[in-house]
A protein has these predicted regions:
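Short S/T/G/P-rich N-terminal loop/turn motif that feeds into the first structured element of a domain
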Residues: 1-57, 65-72, 95-109
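Conserved short beta-strand edge segments in small beta-sheet-based binding/regulatory domains
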Residues: 83-95
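Homeobox/homeodomain signature
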Residues: 35, 81-82
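Short amphipathic alpha-helices in soluble, non-transmembrane regions
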Residues: 72-81
């Protein structure tokens, strides 16, 4: 069972809009190859969600990771691929716990 979750919220930067459609396709093909490599390491990609209509972020993705290190590896791979040159992003990494465990942490605040 995965122990950590990763949420990535992102929106395009002006540099993305400056690329041609062909340049965008080429860039995203490279990102896809890197994602497929990471999935072989136990990361489970839950999906990408379009959210521009409901908030300030264009979209977000969610993954389950076997550990905090694999979540960080996912973020590092995005940086290496040049993702942050074209997209502003905020990440959340958290440890998975039961509802009861989480409620206990709230009581203990």
């Amino acid at each position: 069972m995965p122990d950590y979750g990763l949420i990535e919220m992102f929106r395009p930067r002006p540099e993305w809009y400056a690329l041609s459609r062909e340049e965008r396709r080429t860039f995203l093909a490279g990102c896809r190859r890197e994602i497929e490599r990471l999935l072989g390491g136990g990361v489970r990609f839950l999906g990408v969600y379009a959210s521009r209509w409901s908030g300030e972020w264009h979209g977000y993705s969610a993954c389950e990771c076997p550990g905090a290190d694999s979540a960080q590896e996912w973020i590092d791979a995005a940086e290496k691929a040049g993702w942050f040159r074209y997209f502003e992003q905020a990440n959340l990494v958290g440890r998975k716990m039961s509802l009861e465990e989480y409620f206990h942490t709230l009581v203990e605040l």
